[in-house]
Amino acid sequence: MDEWMNYEQFDRQTWHGFFPTDSVRLTQGNLDEIKSLNDRISIEDVQDVYLPLIKLIQLRYQNFLEWQMQKANFLQRSTMRIPYIIGIAGSVAVGKSTIARLISILLNKMLPDKRVELMTTDGFLYPNAELKRRGIMDRKGFPESYDMERLLKFLNDVKAGEPVVKAPTYSHQVYDVQLDKPLVIDSPDILIVEGINTLQLPSNQQLYVSDYFDWSLYVDADPDLIEHWYLQRFGMLLDTAFTDPSNYYYPYSKGDRQEAFKMAKYVWQRVDLPNLREFILPTKSRADVILHKTTGHVVDKLYLRRG
């Protein structure tokens, strides 16, 4: 079966033509501040890819608000403030975090009267101590390593209009959850939820994370390219960790670099690549938009779900 049968495909030039404007002013310096270590994003990317994407999200959001008003009228009740939730999924090292931050900034500029907040599902990983207790430390990132019940409760509270909801955070520096440093989500109009597991359908659940999404994006790239970006990022992490003994990567930065990369490649092949193939890639067809990247993190194609 053709994996693209329910999508319309657009090349970059065609996509740009749907909203050919540069009305949102950003500098390359602004973009460098939000991009992840080895990611790449340019002013041309914003104009060609992301501004049309933001316009599409804006249209969907307007429809969402209209539906909330119509539903409230039908039920003969006052309109509640219900957050619009955007899910962003894709492999590790594919650039989800950069895209999520960029979308957040652009939405804030395009919708200045709306409160836009951003979070990652990494904080809902079980702490390392719990992963070790369960004997699944080597499965970190796989579906069973997440506290899905807690994540679902968080999303349910947000959708229910709870004014203040707290989410645990994750530190890539110490490679563990930070339960004592929660992220406070305070009455957002739009919430962006980024993570590898946002579109997954765990077999032991009747309720899924994506049930709470109003719109979703999958960031796609060839697995060989993602591996290259993964190892490139690992090298940059080594370069930034060698002066900080508290950093998870510090021991690797002080040891044999070739051995460190050998370890990273092993982790990719034994953990991240199987996770991508078995649990992340199969969720691609559940996204409203698929953003495809090629060499250098350049977006060359976009796929828009029909209907």
Curated annotation (Swiss-Prot):
InterPro entries: P-loop_NTPase, PanK, PRK/URK. GO terms for cellular component: cytoplasm. It catalyses: (R)-pantothenate + ATP = (R)-4'-phosphopantothenate + ADP + H(+). Coiled coil: none annotated. SUPFAM superfamilies: P-loop containing nucleoside triphosphate hydrolases. GO terms for biological process: coenzyme A biosynthetic process. It is found in: Cytoplasm. ATP binds at residues 90-97. This is Pantothenate kinase. It comes from the Bacteria. HAMAP family: Pantothen_kinase_1 (MF_00215). Its EC number is 2.7.1.33. Pathway: Cofactor biosynthesis; coenzyme A biosynthesis; CoA from (R)-pantothenate: step 1/5. Pfam families: PRK. GO terms for molecular function: ATP binding; pantothenate kinase activity. Belongs to the prokaryotic pantothenate kinase family. The keyword Transport does not apply. Signal peptide: none annotated. Keywords: ATP-binding, Coenzyme A biosynthesis, Cytoplasm, Kinase, Nucleotide-binding, Transferase.
